Amino acid sequence: MEQGKHLAGLILAITLLQGTMAQLKEGKHSVLLDDNREDGSVLLTCGLPDQNIRWFKDGKEICSLNNSRSTCNLGSSSKDPRGIYWCEGSKENSKRLQVYYRMCQNCIELNSATVSGFIFTEIISLFFLAVGVYFIAGQDGVRQSRASDKQTLLSNDQLYQPLKDREDDQYSHLQGNNSRKN
């Protein structure tokens, strides 16, 4: 049992040391990002002491500037300069820096998963709406009459009294002298 614990500890130590070795190969110097400029541009500064510096974005060389400059202007932050940047000198590389600008605070990134989610939700909601309309509209509008719904009708003699003969009053004429006859 003791050997199993030592073996597990050895495997864990080797795994952690491999990650440390990978970081050492990447570079000691960092790339600094300056996005608090008045003109809204994004500026990268390389921390390498070398004079001949080349800049890379996602594996492709960018910023073909003078060989003595250690800065790279990415342009305006509104143009979304996202990617993985690093600088390379004649002898060593810097650490990689991932730049990601999200200009819109309440935006949704439309990738295929988001669009398919919207479509799936729309189909499900339309299905529930159709089922609800089917069950509500499918009910019969005619209901069975009950004994309590029946009313006893009275004859006209008991409920109404006959009208009096009209007299020749102001409202008994439609026009001028024409009197109304019954």
From Swiss-Prot:
UniProt keyword Glycoprotein present: yes
Cytoplasmic side: 138-182
Main location: membrane
Chain positions carrying an annotated carbohydrate: N66
Disulphide-bridged cysteine pairs: C46-C87
Keyword Disulfide bond listed: yes
GO biological process, one term: adaptive immune response
Single GO MF descriptor: transmembrane signaling receptor activity
Chain ranges of the ITAM domain: 149-177
Gene3D superfamilies listed in its UniProt record: Immunoglobulins
Motif (Di-leucine motif): 153-154
Modified residues (Phosphoserine): S145, S148
Keyword terms of this UniProt record: Adaptive immunity, Cell membrane, Disulfide bond, Glycoprotein, Immunity, Immunoglobulin domain, Membrane, Phosphoprotein, Receptor, Signal, Transmembrane, Transmembrane helix
Signal peptide as annotated in the record: 1-22
Transmembrane segments annotated in the record for this chain: 117-137
Record topological domains on the Extracellular side: 23-116
Gene Ontology cellular component annotations, sorted alphabetically: alpha-beta T cell receptor complex; external side of plasma membrane
Annotated localization: Cell membrane
Modification note: Phosphorylated on Tyr residues after T-cell receptor triggering by LCK in association with CD4/CD8. Phosphorylated also by PKC; leading to the TCR complex down-regulation. Phosphorylated on Tyr residues after T-cell receptor triggering by LCK in association with CD4/CD8.
Residue intervals of the Ig-like domain: 23-98
Record Pfam families: Ig_4, ITAM
Domain topic, free-text comment: A di-leucine motif and a tyrosine-based motif are individually sufficient to induce both endocytosis and delivery to lysosomes.
Subunit structure: The TCR-CD3 complex is composed of a CD3D/CD3E and a CD3G/CD3E heterodimers that preferentially associate with TCRalpha and TCRbeta, respectively, to form TCRalpha/CD3E/CD3G and TCRbeta/CD3G/CD3E trimers. In turn, the hexamer interacts with CD3Z homodimer to form the TCR-CD3 complex. Alternatively, TCRalpha and TCRbeta can be replaced by TCRgamma and TCRdelta.
UniProt-listed PANTHER family: T-CELL SURFACE GLYCOPROTEIN CD3 GAMMA CHAIN, T-CELL SURFACE GLYCOPROTEIN CD3 GAMMA CHAIN / DELTA CHAIN
Known role: Part of the TCR-CD3 complex present on T-lymphocyte cell surface that plays an essential role in adaptive immune response. When antigen presenting cells (APCs) activate T-cell receptor (TCR), TCR-mediated signals are transmitted across the cell membrane by the CD3 chains CD3D, CD3E, CD3G and CD3Z. All CD3 chains contain immunoreceptor tyrosine-based activation motifs (ITAMs) in their cytoplasmic domain. Upon TCR engagement, these motifs become phosphorylated by Src family protein tyrosine kinases LCK and FYN, resulting in the activation of downstream signaling pathways.
Identification of the protein by name: T-cell surface glycoprotein CD3 gamma chain
Organism: Sus scrofa (Pig)
